[in-house]
């Protein structure tokens, strides 16, 4: 991926411009993920009227699968698709998953769950899990591919990249949790 003739360096930091694209992409992906997680139990118990134990089981299963699927997504990227295609497909699947989660909440009428709400929630979770599997292991790899082997700037690049992850993870629960909990 590294190209010696690539002149797309930021004049301010000495890092490739692609690093900042990856920084913001990952920051917003983490914001989306942790923001959804911040209100997911509330959504299942308040809007879909699930029992707390059932909602906790769904939440735990979702979280576990989100951390398991990158093993398969990384393998598919390494063997067949490559990083870019895997990130693109994963991002699109996660966007579709978030959209379906939004729609599942939009079909709840006066606190009464409908079969379509629950079905859309499950479809949304499925797309989020699969999309994350393709997205997560490959975007970090692309940070390393921006630099030639042995480049001293790579440590700083990963620090910048992980700062994006942490910013998204920090602000998402505060913002989405504050907006999502209406006190009902």
Regions found by a protein language model. Name each.
Residues 89-116:
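C-terminal ends and interior cores of transmembrane alpha-helices
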Residues 79-93:
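Cytoplasmic membrane-interface "Motif A"-like loop-to-helix N-cap segments
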Residues 3-30, 115-117:
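Cytosolic juxtamembrane N-terminal segment immediately preceding the first transmembrane helix
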Residues 65-66, 155-181:
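Glycine-rich segments within core transmembrane alpha-helices of 12-TM secondary carriers
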Residues 44-45, 76-80, 175-183:
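Interfacial helix-cap and linker-helix signal at transmembrane-aqueous boundaries
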Residues 27, 97, 111-135:
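Hydrophobic core of transmembrane alpha-helices in multi-pass small-molecule transporters
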Residues 60-78, 170:
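Central cavity-lining transmembrane alpha-helices of secondary-active solute carriers
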